[in-house]
Amino acid sequence: MAKIPYAILEKGSLLLASPDTDQGVFARSVILLCEHSLNGSFGLILNKTLGLEISDDIFTFDKVSNNNIRFCMGGPLQANQMMLLHSCSEISEQTLEICPSVYLGGDLSFLQEIAASESGPTINLCFGYSGWQAGQLEKEFLEGNWFLAPASYEYVFSDNPDNLWSRILKDLGGKYASLSTVPENLLLN
């Protein structure tokens, strides 16, 4: 797997929390960077799933046929806001391509339509987001709080999000692979 140098801190990168980041929701988090500019950055956490059921408040029909829907905590900011990460390229006017085959956006009617389809695309319903002010993410990166990896469909819609942090570090190889085995509780080491 190709390494991403610091100069490519951009949309479509994955941020992996360093093993010594123990700041609640960001501990061992994998964040898809959805926007990065001089004004700031925002992303969605991929590996903190929520144990939610499909809600009647969201869907106006009786049967949800798409089994590829997952609820995620996108981050600690505006936790009542829902964002859609999905693999459907058919509504390009409503979505932003983050990396190949991964899109952000869509409205409630789009969500209901794809939820009703057995062959519907993979969807992460993300509640909240992670955000950084101008220069903040760069500073955190230079301090060693984050590692970078390229985003891909396979990572964003991983079948095992709980293991995603370790998997990506192993895939990066070298020193990153050895970090993937560091226990969450260093007292157990």
Curated annotation (Swiss-Prot):
GO cellular component, one term: cytosol
Pfam families: DUF179 (PF02622)
Top-level taxonomic group: Bacteria
Gene3D superfamilies from the UniProt entry: VC0467-like
Family according to the record: Belongs to the UPF0301 (AlgH) family.
Name of the protein in question: UPF0301 protein CCA_00630
Organism: Chlamydia caviae (strain ATCC VR-813 / DSM 19441 / 03DC25 / GPIC)
